[in-house]
Design a protein with these regions (language model features):
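Phosphate-coordination/substrate-recognition cap region in phosphate-metabolizing enzymes
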Residues: 37-101
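Acidic, His/Gly-rich catalytic cores of divalent-metal-dependent hydrolytic chemistry
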Residues: 187-199
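Short glycine/proline- and acidic residue-enriched helix-loop micro-motifs
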Residues: 99-120
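Loop-to-helix element that buttresses phosphate recognition and phosphoryl-transfer chemistry
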Residues: 3, 7-61, 113-126
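Generic beta-sheet signal
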Residues: 3, 139-147
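General small-molecule cofactor/ligand-binding pocket signal
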Residues: 4, 72-74, 187
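Domain-level recognition of soluble alpha/beta enzyme cores
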Residues: 161-185
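Glycine-rich phosphate-binding loop signature in dinucleotide/nucleotide-binding domains
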Residues: 43-46, 132-139
Length: 199
């Protein structure tokens, strides 16, 4: 079984350098173009199922990239929950909240603001990944989600301890994982090709 994981296109929060978290922020015009471009990149692949984060930016990405597929949503592959920081500019949070905020942000621990931490997010993403292992061995599945969720998928596949894995995913990049004989394999990480608009 193979999954193709697509990070959403550039969102308004990405553009503004704001905490998106679980906010329903849309894609920018650039993000919409990125989503259409990654659809061209994936055109030759047949998917048996498409699973999408229920947040708007991921849904918009899936609808543009894979318009001929119906999809199901799953909240477990949302971005990390940032609580009361949702929608706020990183610069404003830094100026108003100071060192404690910078420490929490570096640790990806937003529990002080009513959000979640890495361990809580890892549990829900790992549950999602474990559920995927029940799919048919020859299934090909597209997943549209967020950089944070992709990071936790990678941690699950690599069986590494949090937070010791440093990995980043560009907007509308594609990462590929295969599950075979009881084991996950990383095939590709953060592939963008030449189709993703940079400006």
């Amino acid at each position: 079984m193979r999954i193709y994981v697509i990070r959403h296109g550039q969102s308004e929060a990405n553009l503004r350098h704001a905490h998106a978290g679980w906010e329903q922020v849309p894609l920018t015009p650039k993000g919409l173009a990125q989503a259409a471009a990654v659809g061209e990149r994936l055109k030759g692949i047949r998917f048996d199922k498409v699973i999408v984060s229920d947040l708007l930016r991921a849904r918009q990405t899936a609808e543009l990239a894979l318009p001929s597929y119906a999809y199901q949503t799953d909240w477990r592959i949302r971005e990390i929950h940032v609580g009361s920081l949702m929608g706020r500019l990183v610069a404003d949070c830094t100026a108003e909240l100071g060192e404690p905020y910078l420490r929490h942000r570096a640790q990806r621990d937003f529990t002080a603001y009513g959000g979640e931490n890495l361990e809580q997010m890892q549990r829900r993403v790992s549950e999602f990944m474990d559920e995927l292992t029940k799919e048919p061995a020859d299934a090909q599945i597209a997943v549209a989600c967020h950089e944070g969720a992709m990071y936790h998928m990678l941690c699950h596949v690599m069986q590494c301890d949090l937070p010791y894995l440093a990995a980043f995913a560009d907007n509308c990049s594609v990462s590929v994982f295969t599950y075979r004989s009881g084991h996950w394999i990383l095939n590709k990480w953060n592939e963008t090709g030449r189709l993703i608009p940079e400006a």
